[in-house]
Structures are given as C-alpha cells and as structure tokens.
C-alpha cells in the first residue's frame, strides 16, 4: 500500500495500467486477502477465489510444550538439527542472534569447503580479521539481518541455496521475509518478537516465516520447529485498500 511503501506502490500501479491497456484477461495472486475495495484495477473482475493448500507437506512441531522455556534444551535441539539439512533460524532480536552466533562458534567444528573458506578469508581481509561473522561462516552458519551490507547478505543467501557450498544454516531477523526468496527444509523459531520495540509478530508475518519451510522440487517435506510459543497479533485476513495515485490517471 502507499502507506507502507509509497514508491513501490506507484511503480506497481504504473505496471498494472500498462497491463490493462494490453491484456483483456488478467488475474492477481496474493496471500491472506479477505476482500478488495472498489478500484479501477479490479473493476469487472470475478470475486476473490480463496485457495487453501500447500504445494509441499508442512509439518509443525510444537516443541515449546516439551522445552518449557528451558534454554539448555533449546540449545541442545538446535545444535543437533543444524548439523544437517538446510535450516532457517528465526531469532528475531539482535541479542538472540549474537547468542546463537557464539553457540555455533563454540560448538561446531570448521567445515572444509573451498567456497566457505574463501568467503571467510575475504571478510577478514576486507572488514576485520576478528569479525565473528567470518568465524561463524567457517562453521557453516550465516547471518541475515538489516545491519549487514546487502552484498554480504545476498552472497550468504547464494551460498545457502547452493546444496554443495557447506553453508547449511542461516540465522535471521524479520529481514528474511522482506524480499528474500529462499527456503529450507527446516524453519526453527528460536524467539518470536518482531524486533520492533519488542512487539510480537503479526500472524501474517509469522505465516510468511513458516512459509519458508519446504519448496516444490527441492524440499518436498518442510518442518517448522517452534521452540517458543507463538503469541501473535491477530491479522489473519486482510481487506486490501488500493489508493490510486492521481498523477497516473489521465
């Protein structure tokens, strides 16, 4: 919407206007939309058709019922799980990322991967020889958050998507759902805060995070491991309000 992202909203509207001039048929796909207000883009279209299905099998594991806020049990599980497969770890807050970072650095052995060693050495040479991220990378674990240079996060995602790179786990904040197209066999919910004033996530954001588990033709079975209870702000269905930029109409 224009409220959340005015620049991108205008660009999208420009694209829709061009599409409308060229095509007599069109349809739109969007998650969690309950209704759409009257607007020129959807005028005359059939009502919303709601679809509720997954292209992969998604298994939910509510481990918080067994863990019961036991920090040591959380650590034990995450160390065991992250030794194999592809894992996305949602840690929410920077202090939680730091905690996990130190855990992996202390407990995991360095992996023997040419790409990983080369990247770690590059980080040490161009940033800081004692940078924790450079040491963490050697353990086969990366970090994705808004504080890192974009090129560094993008390259980590590239390594993560490479089955043979050796980078099998990514620790992330909500930056994971902001324009990053990646997936994993396992999504691990380490903490549930949004990071913005320590508020809980909305149910919509949480669905987006869980949706990273599994991917058609890659991970046919995805796992969501909840190590903490997901206390969410309810936002299950959205009424989409489209504000038209008057400068585009004419």
What does each model-identified segment do?
Residues 2-3, 35, 178, 215:
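Residues immediately C-terminal
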Residues 35-82:
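Interdomain hinge/linker at the junction between the two RecA-like core domains of SF2 helicases
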Residues 1-26:
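SF2 helicase catalytic motif II
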Residues 22, 42-44, 137, 182-183:
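Short, structured coil segments at secondary-structure junctions
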Residues 1, 29-33, 91-94, 172-176, ...:
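A short beta-strand-to-loop transition that corresponds to the Sensor-1 phosphate-sensing loop
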Residues 99-100, 244-250:
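Long, largely alpha-helical accessory region at the distal end of helicase-like NTP-driven motors
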Residues 20-34, 186, 190-195, 199-243:
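Conserved segment of the helicase C-terminal RecA-like domain
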Residues 65-69, 74-76, 81-169, 184, ...:
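Conserved C-terminal RecA-like helicase domain
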């Amino acid at each position: 919407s224009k409220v959340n992202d005015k620049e991108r909203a205008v660009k999208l509207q420009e694209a829709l206007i061009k599409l409308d001039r060229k095509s007599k048929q069109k349809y739109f796909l969007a998650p969690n939309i309950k209704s759409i207000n009257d607007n020129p883009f959807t005028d005359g279209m059939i009502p919303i058709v709601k679809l509720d299905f997954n292209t992969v099998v998604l298994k939910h594991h509510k481990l918080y019922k067994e863990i019961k806020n036991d920090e040591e049990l959380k650590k034990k599980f995450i160390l065991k799980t992250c030794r194999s497969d592809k894992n996305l770890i949602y840690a929410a807050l920077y202090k939680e990322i730091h905690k996990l970072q130190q855990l992996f650095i202390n407990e995991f052995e360095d992996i023997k991967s040419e790409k990983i060693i080369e990247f770690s050495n590059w980080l040490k040479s161009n940033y800081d020889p004692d940078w924790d991220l450079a040491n963490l990378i050697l353990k086969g674990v990366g970090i994705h958050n808004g504080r890192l240079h974009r090129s560094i996060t993008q390259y980590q995602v590239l390594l993560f998507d490479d089955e043979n790179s050796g980078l099998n786990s990514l620790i992330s904040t909500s930056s994971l759902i902001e324009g990053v197209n990646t997936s994993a066999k396992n999504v691990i919910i380490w903490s549930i805060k949004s990071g913005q004033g320590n508020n809980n996530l909305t149910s919509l954001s949480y669905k987006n995070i869980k949706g990273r588990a599994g991917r058609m033709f890659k991970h046919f079975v995805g796992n969501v491991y909840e190590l903490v209870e997901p206390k969410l702000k309810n936002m299950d269905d959205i009424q989409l309000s489209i504000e038209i930029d008057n400068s585009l109409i004419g």
